[in-house]
Amino acid sequence: MLEGSPNLPQWDNLPLAQQLTEKLNVPVVLENDIRAALVGEMWKGHCRHTHSCALIGIGTGLGSALLMDGKVIRGANNAAGEIGYMMFARDHLFRNWRNKGCFESFCSGSGLSERMASLRGENLSAIEIIQASQQGDPLAQSLVEEMADYLAIGIMNLVAIANLEKVVLTGGITRSADTFLPRVQANLDRHLFANTKVNIELSELWEKGPLYGIAILALATVYPSIQFMPEIQLR
């Protein structure tokens, strides 16, 4: 059942997996892309042998998936990890974030582009803004630094809640992580206590992560007696 997708309101409460199963006459498994990517990281990436970690995807939008005590967290309505809607200041309460979450507005490709357009009137892609920051553009540098600071705050909040062992970053924006990750790490080093220090790593699976993950989930659904990752609760 598809529920609560702000980008697909017309599909809300649609039993898509059931309909596809009936139409194709084969079992169909659906999963959120970032959660599927987390399962991929658990099988073949940086989340192997880890029981508490977060995968944060920074691309056009912002999302995350959480592994806590060996269990993939889904939440009451399958919406756990929607960190794009996190807020960080009192004045954020007085703005409408329904179409794009507060955190996502400051820490995503679309958010970067919208911030540049509102401040300078230029329609640049996030990659163009990052490149401009590398070339010394003051506004672009300020926006990238702002994104890094918000990302650090978001990670610190996740660590405070879940005491994570590791945070893995993925998504198109993280291919330019050398531009902003040192600032993120410096903020984490400055503000996290010694017993909550967390490793930040970049995914090496990229677009293969969700493919690996959904394959594992599909096999686990069709062949539930087989323990693909015995130490992990997938569903």
Task: Label every model-predicted segment.
Residues 33, 59:
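Active-site glycine-centered loops adjacent to acidic/histidine catalytic or metal-binding residues
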Residues 1-13, 165-166, 171:
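Short beta-strand-loop/turn "lid" adjacent to the catalytic site in phosphate-handling enzymes
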Residues 18-26, 40-50, 72, 90-235:
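ATP-binding/phosphotransfer module of carbohydrate and carboxylate kinases, centering on a glycine-rich
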Residues 28-32:
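General beta-strand structural signal in soluble alpha/beta enzymes
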Residues 79-92:
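A short, polar/charged loop-to-alpha-helix boundary motif
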Residues 2, 72-73:
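Hydrophobic "anchor" residues
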Residues 53-57, 63-65:
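Short glycine-aspartate micro-motif
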Residues 68-69:
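A cytosolic small-molecule/anion-sensing beta-strand core signal
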